[in-house]
């Protein structure tokens, strides 16, 4: 709700996903820029409540799917790469982090949120990504 107030708009929740100690929330504005998608990462504290980690980030749009890397917690090199899928065609992503081996990630049918985790380095990270439909064609 606080984010909606800052955006001067009502927000519509699209997904709330709990994964271990993390909670991810994907949302959009009802009226202003309704085609934008936003994501925020929360972390469970000692009391068992979720606290926001960082601020809401606008996801990068590529056709009918949206992408956003979310960094780790204070010194943690883990990166969570978020894919919000609204495409009926998107089925698979292939990632090559830090010039390492390629990893294939299945994307659930739309609408869906996929979180893929990888390790960055001390000096940051680099990621090549490609997205494919069910016939194996790059999108």
Language-model segments: residues:
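Short, solvent-exposed mixed-charge patches
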Residues: 84-85, 139
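Surface-exposed loop/turn elements that mediate protein-protein interactions on large endomembrane-trafficking
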Residues: 44-55, 96-98, 134-136
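Short beta-strand elements that form the blades of beta-propeller/WD-repeat-like
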Residues: 23-28, 77-84
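Extracellular ectodomain segments of secreted/surface proteins
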Residues: 54-82
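N-terminal export/targeting and maturation segments
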Residues: 1-51
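Residues that act as N-cap/strand-start positions at coil-to-secondary-structure junctions
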Residues: 10, 36, 77, 101, ...
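Ser/Thr-rich low-complexity repeats and stalk/linker segments
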Residues: 93-139
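A short, structured loop/turn motif at beta-sheet edges
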Residues: 86-92
């Amino acid at each position: 709700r606080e984010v909606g107030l800052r955006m001067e708009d009502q927000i519509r929740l699209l997904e709330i996903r709990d994964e271990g100690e993390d909670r991810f929330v994907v949302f959009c504005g009802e009226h202003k820029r309704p085609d934008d998608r936003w994501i925020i990462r929360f972390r469970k504290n000692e009391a068992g409540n979720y606290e926001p980690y960082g601020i809401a980030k606008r996801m990068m749009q590529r056709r009918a799917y949206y992408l956003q890397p979310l960094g780790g917690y204070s010194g943690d090199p883990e990166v969570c790469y978020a894919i919000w899928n609204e495409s009926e065609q998107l089925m698979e992503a292939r990632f090559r982090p830090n010039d390492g081996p390629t990893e294939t990630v299945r994307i659930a049918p739309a609408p869906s949120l996929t979180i893929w985790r990888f390790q960055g380095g001390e000096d940051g990270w680099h990621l090549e990504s490609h997205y494919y439909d069910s016939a194996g064609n790059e999108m």
